[in-house]
Amino acid sequence: MIDLSPLARRLAGTPLAEWANTLQVQLDKKMEKGHGDLERWQSALDALPKIQPTEVDLLDGLKLDTNCDDETRAQMRTALMGLSPWRKGPFDLFGVHVDTEWRSDWKWSRVSPHLDLKGKRILDVGCGNGYYMWRMLGAGADSVIGVDPNWLFFCQFQAVQRYLSEPNAWHLPFPFEDLPPNLEGFDTVFSMGVFYHRRSPIEHLLALKDCLVKGGELVLETLVVEGDKHQVLVPEDRYAQMRNVWFLPSVPALELWLRRAGFTDVRCVDVSMTTVDEQRGTEWMKYQSLSDFLDPDDHSKTIEGLPAPMRAVIVAKK
């Protein structure tokens, strides 16, 4: 059982207190339903060695370490490999380098210089395995709550969390839609790599805004295309082999949508092409990756002939 009472205590006296007191029941019900692979992943978690870090670095990466022997490291590696595939990272856990599909540290280095997270209460929507949540804590956040319905990501988060005492980060295996409306309790809300999967992009922006306190900050990272404020790509079918991609606006169009949704001080702080060095297959993620989704003769296009992935980071205030 995952005990959420520390989260309820952390949020006592905040606008999120009432919601926090409902989460244990909601999580327990979700755990009862379970998932077909949950038992296998739980076995991997149970196989993790029972050691404590003497070195913790969440600021310059994600590294936990202590003096341990080769046998312990081998046990750690086998258990972590049992939670494959690992998408977001990398993680350095007691001498085991988890070389994830994504170099998420590169994205964080593009995003974090534009943010002040010290003392902030943060919501990370579509948090994956929680890599960015740990980096947010490293940047001084007061507390971070991530929501993502993927059970494997939930278990990967638990693998790291068990080695950190009172980490002030919680992964809830819920879809964003399960959050109640008008929470208005977070200083900063992140939505990274989620927006283009939404069929109703403006509704997503409004829902994100409802989670923020007045004056709070949204950090939105999503796929974009070149063009003016009227330019939006809607794929006919797949985009980079993904079926669930709906809207890829230009940066000016996205900024317009944010203003229309009621955000102010809207600014684009980064635009970057996604390269096959940043997203690729590894021994920790052995399935297809970006190189398989691009035109083999022209990496400026996807395999469908559409513009290759380009990502923008937009920051805006409520």
Swiss-Prot record:
Pfam families recorded: Methyltransf_9
Protein origin, superkingdom: Bacteria
Annotated catalysed reactions: carboxy-S-adenosyl-L-methionine + 5-hydroxyuridine(34) in tRNA = 5-carboxymethoxyuridine(34) in tRNA + S-adenosyl-L-homocysteine + H(+)
Record-annotated disulphide pairs: none
Role played: Catalyzes carboxymethyl transfer from carboxy-S-adenosyl-L-methionine (Cx-SAM) to 5-hydroxyuridine (ho5U) to form 5-carboxymethoxyuridine (cmo5U) at position 34 in tRNAs.
Family note: Belongs to the class I-like SAM-binding methyltransferase superfamily. CmoB family.
Protein's name according to its UniProt entry: tRNA U34 carboxymethyltransferase
Organism listed in the record: Pseudomonas fluorescens (strain Pf0-1)
Species lineage: Bacteria, Pseudomonadati, Pseudomonadota, Gammaproteobacteria, Pseudomonadales
Gene: cmoB
